[in-house]
């Protein structure tokens, strides 16, 4: 009679245990399809002031070409559909058309290295312009804990 409820509880507890050992965040939300339906994407516009510090000319992270303002988009390097989070350490400026065409692919290691280097440079600027803020602290922690690489490995 309670088999479905019990099965859900066991799966949920199992994913909590996995999250203790696995650096891939939100495993339970990935395992349960219903969680995904309830998650809504938020506007990334609040990150522009930070991204502008390191990339004031709005050069596409992937193509290296300057982006016209009307074609400027903020993108997750590691797909949002894998991490379900909007963190500065994973966000870059891209051309809208490129962003639409790339889909939810897991990036190559060279892209991860480029993002890691970008974050180091961005952190230096943020520590001067936005010291002691939550966003700066999160970026610093992501670098110190190698979060990009761990998340990338978890997505693969």
State where each predicted segment sits:
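Detector for Asparagine
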Residues: 4, 11, 22, 38, ...
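Short, charged surface segments at domain edges that flank catalytic/cofactor-binding sites
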Residues: 1-59
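Generic hydrophobic, helix-prone segments enriched in Leu/Val/Ile
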Residues: 14, 47-51, 67, 114-118, ...
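C-terminal structured domain segments
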Residues: 96-156
